[in-house]
Curated annotation (Swiss-Prot):
PTM sites of type Phosphotyrosine: 149, 247
Positions of the Protein kinase domain: 69-350
InterPro entries, sorted: Kinase-like_dom_sf, Plant_Ser_Thr_Prot_Kinase, Prot_kinase_dom, Protein_kinase_ATP_BS, Ser-Thr/Tyr_kinase_cat_dom, Ser/Thr_kinase_AS
Protein name from the UniProt record: Probable serine/threonine-protein kinase PBL8
UniProt modified residues of type Phosphoserine: 203, 233
Positions with biased composition (Basic and acidic residues): 1-10
Pfam family, one: PK_Tyr_Ser-Thr
Provenance organism: Arabidopsis thaliana
Lipidated residue numbers (N-myristoyl glycine): 2
Protein family (similarity comment): Belongs to the protein kinase superfamily. Ser/Thr protein kinase family.
Subcellular location: Cell membrane
Oligomer status and interactors: Interacts with the Xanthomonas campestris effector XopAC/AvrAC.
Topological relation to the membrane, as annotated: Lipid-anchor
Transmembrane feature ranges: none
Gene symbol of the encoding locus: PBL8
Length: 410
């Protein structure tokens, strides 16, 4: 693999070696540390932890996989690098199976680029879920940083929503994608060591051949607050138009910051509009500013639904989806639902539209007509001043203090 750290560093740290390093650095602040079970990189480390499910590749092997990074193999380009399509042949190395892959080559931008690369390896090396893109391997050779992912045949949600040459996604498919992405975020937030994704947007939601949504690009992910901490303080990073307002203003990051970003993406899926579009009239350039006041108005919300979805959904389904987006986009983070609430709210919507997807059979489905929450009747008396901007409370700590868990009563 070559050397991707200093000369006296091993190419890859084992978890045991990392634990020994941590004991030596125990006096450092929490933000500088990780333990073998925590998906957080060490700020002084230049090499990833080794994981049984993640393969270390040589640069020569990845050149072979991508035909020397041929320009016509490029799948996309972004701020962190270029992604190429590749194919692992079973003759490449003993024990490897033949499969198509996506190879991301990071820009050579020094420490910051390396840290983002290392974050992806250390998060995706540990986290496995049907709605997270699978990290197959990596390469760390000299100043080269590469990542190898499973190949996602359908590309990004962004392309399907906004490319004029792409057939528009149906209502049922959009709801299916929204649910899959929500499950991915809920998994991160509910992990033993919670993870804040920090860069949830349509270009980071990839679709496989069955349109299963998978979150990709974990370069900005952060370990969530621990113990009595209420938030993580960090430099503001992400994408304009998706970042939560309180995070932009203060640098205070919580799981509810991701919920806001989810609300923006859901709004993009409902309207077919970009979060920020400078080609539109000035009052319509910021999607949230333009659409959110209409989301809770039954007379206006149908005016903002993507016209390409005409006759594909029921009015009731549109109201439910718009109401969910409304609360996800609350200015007050505490009024936003938890991602687990979002999942329960979206599950019953899988049986609407063109009925290609079977109806959900969860308890949430049975209670959905009454507000979208299991055991709704038991909790109804705890909702007060129900309506836009209301502060609602639930006796169950698994529910959010606002949003779908208690407030979406009409």
């Amino acid at each position: 693999m070559g050397n991707c750290g200093t000369r006296d560093e091993a190419a890859v740290f084992t978890p045991q070696a990392q634990a020994q390093q941590l004991q030596k650095k125990h006096s450092r602040s929490v933000s500088d540390l990780s333990d073998p079970s925590t998906p957080r990189f060490r700020d002084d480390s230049r090499t990833p932890i080794s994981y049984a499910q993640v393969i270390p590749f040589t640069l020569f092997e990845l050149e072979t996989i991508t035909k020397s990074f041929r320009p016509d193999y490029i799948l996309g380009e972004g701020g962190f690098g270029t992604v190429y399509k590749g194919y692992i042949d079973d003759n490449l190395r003993v024990g490897l199976k033949s499969l198509p892959v996506a190879v991301k080559v990071l820009n050579k931008e020094g420490l910051q680029g390396h840290r983002e690369w290392l974050t992806e390896v250390n998060f995706l090396g540990q986290l496995r879920h049907p709605n997270l893109v699978k990290l197959i391997g990596y390469c760390c050779e000299d100043d080269h940083r590469l990542l190898v992912y499973e190949f996602m045949l359908r590309g990004s949600l962004e392309n399907h929503l906004f490319r004029k040459t792409t057939a528009p996604l149906s209502w049922s498919r959009r709801m299916m994608i929204a649910l899959g992405a929500a499950k991915g975020l809920a998994f991160l937030h509910n992990a033993e060591r919670p993870v804040i994704y920090r860069d949830f947007k349509t270009s980071n939601i990839l679709l496989d051949s069955d349109y299963t949504a998978k979150l990709s690009d974990f370069g900005l992910a952060k370990a969530g607050p621990q113990g009595d901490e209420t938030h993580v303080s960090t430099r503001v990073m992400g994408t304009y138009g998706y970042a939560a307002p309180e995070y932009v203003m203060t640098g205070h990051l919580t799981a509810r910051s991701d919920v806001y970003s989810f609300g923006v993406v859901l709004l993009e899926m409902l309207t077919g509009r970009k979060s920020v579009d400078k080609t539109r009239p000035s009052k319509e350039q910021n999607l949230v500013d333009w659409a959110r006041p209409k989301l809770n108005d039954k007379r206006k919300l149908l005016q903002i639904i993507d016209p390409r979805l005409e006759n594909q959904y029921s009015v009731r389904a549109a109201q439910k989806a718009c109401s969910l987006a409304y609360y996800c986009l609350s200015q007050n983070p505490k009024a936003r639902p938890l991602m687990s609430d979002v999942v329960e709210t979206l599950e019953p919507l899988q049986c609407t539209g063109d009925a290609l997807i079977p109806c959900a059979t969860t308890t949430a489905g049975a209670a959905f007509a009454m507000g979208g929450v299991p055991d709704y009747r038991m909790h109804r008396r705890f909702a007060k001043n129900v309506g836009p901007g209301a502060i609602c409370r639930s006796p169950n700590p698994n529910y959010s203090p606002g949003g779908p868990a208690a407030c979406r009563v009409r």
